[in-house]
From Swiss-Prot:
This is Deoxyribose-phosphate aldolase 2. Catalyzes a reversible aldol reaction between acetaldehyde and D-glyceraldehyde 3-phosphate to generate 2-deoxy-D-ribose 5-phosphate. Keywords: Cytoplasm, Lyase, Schiff base. Its EC number is 4.1.2.4. HAMAP family: DeoC_type1. One of its GO terms (biological process) is deoxyribonucleotide catabolic process. Pathway: Carbohydrate degradation; 2-deoxy-D-ribose 1-phosphate degradation; D-glyceraldehyde 3-phosphate and acetaldehyde from 2-deoxy-alpha-D-ribose 1-phosphate: step 2/2. Coiled coil: none annotated. GO terms for cellular component: cytoplasm. Its main location: cytoplasm. It comes from Staphylococcus aureus (strain COL). InterPro entries: Aldolase_TIM, DeoC, DeoC/FbaB/LacD_aldolase, DeoC_typeI. The gene is deoC2.
Length: 220
């Protein structure tokens, strides 16, 4: 397993500067991470800087609340793809899920999948705000909507991924789609727990620390 290829090297802070974006791009190229995940305003720049690299550009849609209208999310997705995004991480309509308006949740995801035109779509369900049954339902809706991944967290809601939630999500979706763990994955121990639970992608701002931990691990 090439652990670096599981990592979306992430910088989504609102105060992110061009200098900081340059840093994560350089790190992603050096460590051969799967992608850099940046806010939409940085997509075009990141795509230009990574044009000669295997590192993909990932961005976020309806982020971090998921409370944008479906039309807005679809437009944001089209704009991001036009600017060079390879992968889309969207946030579901969490309130609609809690209301039991499952058709609305699924249609919201489907609109982004359609707008992404074949590009990878990961669906953030914000597990810290959901109970067991809601996590199961959100995962089922993500699968039914044709997305590629179900993802735990934005990292902006006061909690992140847990191995228990990742396992529940993976058990729910099976082999049909993948699971991304994000939020609070800060070191090699966290990384290993998420992978063992079934995650095949890790979103982390600590990608370098994780890789340094792997290099220091005598079993690696």
């Amino acid at each position: 397993m090439n652990s670096a290829k599981l990592i979306d090297h992430t910088l989504l802070k609102p105060e992110s500067t061009r200098t900081q974006i340059d840093q994560i791009i350089d790190e992603a190229k050096a460590y051969h991470f799967k992608s850099v995940c940046v806010n939409p305003t940085h997509v075009k720049y990141a795509a230009e800087r990574l044009a000669d690299s295997e590192v993909l550009v990932c961005t976020v849609i309806g982020f971090p609340l998921g409370a944008s209208t479906t039309a807005t999310k679809a437009f944001e997705t089209e704009d991001a793809i036009q600017n060079g995004a390879d992968e889309i991480d969207m946030v579901i309509n969490i309130g609609a899920l809690k209301d039991g308006r499952f058709d609305d949740v699924q249609q919201d995801i489907e609109a982004v999948v359609k707008a992404a035109k074949g590009h990878t779509v990961k669906v953030i369900i914000e597990t810290v705000l959901l109970d067991h049954d809601e996590i199961v339902k959100a995962s089922e809706l993500t699968k039914a909507a044709g997305a590629d991944f179900v993802k735990t967290s934005t990292g902006f809601a006061g909690g992140g991924a847990t191995a228990e939630d990742v396992k529940l999500m993976k058990d729910t979706v099976g082999a049909d789609i993948e699971v991304k763990a994000s939020g609070g994955v800060r070191n090699l121990e966290d990384f290993n727990k998420m992978v063992e639970a079934g995650a095949t992608r890790i979103g982390a701002s600590a990608g370098v620390q994780i890789m340094q931990g792997l290099e220091a691990d005598s079993d690696y």
